[in-house]
From Swiss-Prot:
Keywords: Acetylation, Chlorophyll, Chloroplast, Chromophore, Electron transport, Iron, Magnesium, Membrane, Metal-binding, Oxidoreductase, Phosphoprotein, Photosynthesis, Photosystem II, Plastid, Thylakoid, Transmembrane, Transmembrane helix, Transport
Residues at which chlorophyll a ChlzD2 binds: H118
One Gene Ontology cellular component annotation held by this UniProt entry: photosystem II
Recorded topology in the membrane: Multi-pass membrane protein
Enzyme kind, highest EC tier: oxidoreductase
Catalytic activities: 2 a plastoquinone + 4 hnu + 2 H2O = 2 a plastoquinol + O2
Protein name: Photosystem II D2 protein
Gene: psbD
Residues modified as Phosphothreonine: T2
Disulfide bond residue pairs: none
Provenance organism: Panax ginseng (Korean ginseng)
Annotated positions binding Fe cation: H215, H269
SUBUNIT field: PSII is composed of 1 copy each of membrane proteins PsbA, PsbB, PsbC, PsbD, PsbE, PsbF, PsbH, PsbI, PsbJ, PsbK, PsbL, PsbM, PsbT, PsbX, PsbY, PsbZ, Psb30/Ycf12, at least 3 peripheral proteins of the oxygen-evolving complex and a large number of cofactors. It forms dimeric complexes.
Pfam families on file: Photo_RC
More details: 2 of the reaction center chlorophylls (ChlD1 and ChlD2) are entirely coordinated by water.
Amino acid sequence: MTIALGKFTEDEKDLFDIMDDWLRRDRFVFVGWSGLLLFPCAYFALGGWFTGTTFVTSWYTHGLASSYLEGCNFLTAAVSTPANSLAHSLLLLWGPEAQGDFTRWCQLGGLWTFVALHGAFGLIGFMLRQFELARSVQLRPYNAIAFSGPIAVFVSVFLIYPLGQSGWFFAPSFGVAAIFRFILFFQGFHNWTLNPFHMMGVAGVLGAALLCAIHGATVENLYFEDGDGANTFRAFNPTQAEETYSMVTANRFWSQIFGVAFSNKRWLHFFMLFVPVTGLWMSALGVVGLALNLRAYDFVSQEIRAAEDPEFETFYTKNILLNEGIRAWMAAQDQPHENLIFPEEVLPRGNAL
């Protein structure tokens, strides 16, 4: 019989409690449990992007130069997607494609999947960080809920859309000019600007910008400073510590301008949260639809009439011809592996030509 001598107290902490104390300790930069996901993923995503844009070519995947080493600048450098022949392979460094060869892995486009997946989990980690801190200081979690909008857009564009297509090849590459090319691709192949989900996204983002401008200007206008020397030009101090603006005055002002105004701060700020986040969610939903090649707003009757009547043309039919041109020119350049050749006589020409 074995007898263990010792005294167990309730103050004794297990490993989880020790880690919890260290991770959530009050320090200059909060770590938290979410930091175990956020910091490594953000580090690898940014590190992979800087490495790719500095050193790695896209010659083997797109037939392009895409790094500073090859002469690109900040606007033209990119971490490009893998070749279409690799489909939806995760392109793990130790996988059958690269077989542990780092140079080969970079040539195949492995950095793109590396950056995309670590970037997605890094964004999720940042949202969890906001949840964790909100819970620690007893706030509502609306900051984290709002950040789900950018996460939804990133995941839908960089992951779900190419999963619905033939491979990662059709996702955006990580670069400024590369994103612009992807936008043109979306327009030419999906008529994205006429998609109602895109319209809701634009309304949400631009509407949020308008709301921010109005809100900031209104609050700034209502700052006041008491004192004998105060006048119209000296009474406003944007750096003062006290919150001195009047909601009643703001309500009276905008009631006279528009005829309607927000009645309280809670409804006003909820609306400023609702507009951009809903717009981002709707645009993400639309991209999921494009992944399945769903179409919206095809006005076929106008196309038929424009084809039959040389004098009939609308802005819609002109845009359709423009989309055909984008497809014809972009497909041959963007998908060289398909060996697409479009003779001059089949390229789209509008009635005006």
